[in-house]
Amino acid sequence: MQPATDIRLRPLHEDFEAEGPGSNGNGHRPLPVIGGNVVDPERISAEVEEMGAEEAIAWAIDTFGSALGFAVSFQKTSSVIMDMAHRIDPNVHFFYLDTELLFPETYETRDRLATHFGIEFERFVQDNPPNLRERWEAGEWGEGDECCATRKVATMRRALEGIDCWVSGIRRVDSETRADAPRFGWDVRFDRWKLNPLADWDDKRVWNYIKDQKVPYNPLHDQGYPSIGCMPCTSPAAEGEDARAGRWAGTDRTECGING
């Protein structure tokens, strides 16, 4: 496989700055880099789009090495990605965000996956979190922006320190907000590369893989939860509803701020 750094030197683009870390004061971002070379996000995204899920994961492991991090949500797509990655390299870095509001079944899934793969997850939790759950349940925050920002987004920023590319399990079929998700691209939220290896997979393909490879998965999926987050803001979705209809049900919110 030809290294990305050999063929994708990037011309300047108005969305990015040419020199220096961080913003240049005009809202522009630093130019994306792989292996010390500035690269063209659109070109590299198009090339990785042509890869299959396992090939894309193998490419990312080879390209980013120890600067690659796999974010694990303990949902069905995480089970698939973990199995693929572990078969390629048993030493890849798996981490998760512990909001301390996850379902008991989610923590149990974490433990079963750790045993299945013989690994330890790196856990990230908000330092000294305020008592947010009671305020959320009391309806003080509307759609829960502050809770997600505190327990998820801020914690994710810490988790990504030292990471050049992170791996997510989002798919285009999840919701309208994810319909155009690339398999690989520059994540402007965190100023890092992001790989979505299962971007083009549907539920049937995910479940066939899990069953064929006998990978542990979250039992809440068998109880009407197509998407699983924190207990206070996750409910089952009715048949035929959007896969994320059970997240922040009754509100216009569909994302926590990490993926959208």
Which residues are covered by each model-predicted region?
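Nucleotide-activated chemistry modules centered on ATP-dependent adenylation/adenylyltransferase
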Residues: 2-260
